[in-house]
Each structure stands twice: as C-alpha cells, then as structure tokens.
C-alpha cells in the first residue's frame, strides 16, 4: 500500500520547483512505496521585505514563474523584527491534508523544515485534524531545519517535545541554516526518536545515491 509524504519547500521556492530539485530523493522514496506531494506556500510578499541574509537563497530558488513576489510559509513581523506562521498557512495545510492525505510522514527543507518541525510538536492539534482524518505521523525529516525563535512559540516546543521519529539533515557547508539552528530543532525532539545525518554540501537537499540510501536505511529501521 502506497504511503503519502508531505513535502514542504523552502523560502521563495514552489512545490514544482522543490519537486524538480528532489528527483533522486523522490525516486528512492517511490521504491520504498511512498508517494510525495508538493504543495506551494499560499503567502506571497515583495522581495524587498526579505532579510538580506536570505538573498542567496532567493537568487538560487525562483518561484513558479507566475508569482512576482516571494512565496513563503512564514511572514515577517515588522513590529518585532521576527516572523510568525500566519493563519493562511494553517488553513491551507489543513485543507491540503484533507484533500490529499492522510500522510505517513512530512519532509521539509529550510523554512519548510522549520514549519514541519513546529507542526510535528502536535500535527493534528495545530492543524485542527482528527485522528480519523490524519492518523499519527510515522516520521518527520528536516533538511536544514530550525526551531522557531520568536518567544510566542517556545512554550509549544517545551510542552510538546517532538516524539515522532525524526531525521535532521545538516550540510557541512551550509551558511544559511547554521549548525546551531539545526541543533536547536534536533534538541526539541525526544532523545530516543531523533537522528542526525550530515552531508558534505551546502544549503540544499542532497540527491546523491549515497545520501538517499542512508535515508532509505533510516526509514526501513522504523518499520
């Protein structure tokens, strides 16, 4: 029986773009009986509103060709200089799960991994889903992921440690999501459920045969 996986792209990407950048990963997942779904973030804001340190990501990750703004799961909060997850993202993912799920796992890259990690603290509760609509997740994978930093989210992580089996992928040359940020999300998971996997590259989802084989081995250990 095919199992569905929810794939959350990074800042300024789209579902189609993320799919094109994860062909090798997707091929290996399909061999294991998984079907990958790539939604596109519902929020769009002007490139000028994006922090300077994310410029490299935007330049290397164009949208779907129809959007002139930057697609994102999160929105900037000008009053604090931080960010927040808007209700539009929650509502969109709620409906997406109902229409395309249920999902066995969730995989995120960069901002998508941050969102996936936050949702993994209480996937059904945060998205307003019953266990009939969405059974408990079987796994969670974060590539260049991070724990939300704004203060209003800390209680959620502290009261609901991520207990879903999780794989945290960190690039040794990643200058966008620093090791400390990856470690922050990793430390938000229970000790017996988390695994850290390094790769020699930067800020991207590796597609090499060696990497996807390690992911496959991790998934097979869960069954």
Curated annotation (Swiss-Prot):
InterPro entries: AB_hydrolase_fold (IPR029058), FSH-like_dom (IPR005645), LovG (IPR050593). Its EC number is 3.1.-.-. It is an enzyme of class 3 (hydrolase). The active site is at residues 110, 174, 203. One of its GO terms (molecular function) is hydrolase activity. SUPFAM superfamilies: alpha/beta-Hydrolases (SSF53474). GO terms for cellular component: cytoplasm; nucleus. It comes from the Eukaryota. The keyword Cytoplasm applies. Keywords: Cytoplasm, Hydrolase, Serine esterase. It is found in: Cytoplasm. The keyword Hydrolase applies. Belongs to the AB hydrolase 3 family. Present with 1070 molecules/cell in log phase SD medium. Serine hydrolase of unknown specificity. This is Family of serine hydrolases 2. It comes from Saccharomyces cerevisiae (strain ATCC 204508 / S288c) (Baker's yeast).
């Amino acid at each position: 029986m095919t199992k569905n996986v929810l794939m959350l792209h990074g800042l300024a990407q789209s579902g189609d773009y993320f799919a094109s950048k994860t062909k090798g990963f997707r091929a290996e997942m399909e061999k294991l009986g998984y079907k990958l779904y790539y939604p596109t973030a519902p929020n769009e804001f002007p490139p000028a509103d994006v922090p300077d340190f994310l410029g490299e990501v935007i330049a290397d990750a164009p949208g779907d060709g129809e959007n002139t703004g930057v697609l994102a799961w999160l929105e900037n909060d000008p009053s604090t200089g931080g960010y927040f997850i808007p209700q539009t993202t929650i509502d969109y993912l709620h409906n997406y799960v109902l229409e395309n799920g249920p999902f066995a796992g969730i995989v995120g890259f960069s901002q998508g991994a941050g969102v996936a990690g936050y949702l993994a603290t209480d996937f059904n509760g945060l998205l307003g889903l019953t266990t009939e609509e969405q059974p408990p997740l079987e796994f969670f994978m974060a590539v260049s992921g991070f724990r939300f930093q704004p203060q209003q989210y800390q209680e959620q992580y502290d009261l609901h440690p991520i207990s879903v089996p999780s794989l945290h992928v960190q690039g040794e040359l990643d200058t966008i999501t620093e090791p400390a940020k990856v470690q922050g999300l990793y430390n938000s998971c229970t000790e017996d459920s988390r695994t850290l996997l390094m790769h020699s590259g930067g800020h991207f989802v590796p597609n090499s045969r060696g990497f996807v084989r390690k992911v496959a081995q991790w998934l097979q250990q869960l069954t």
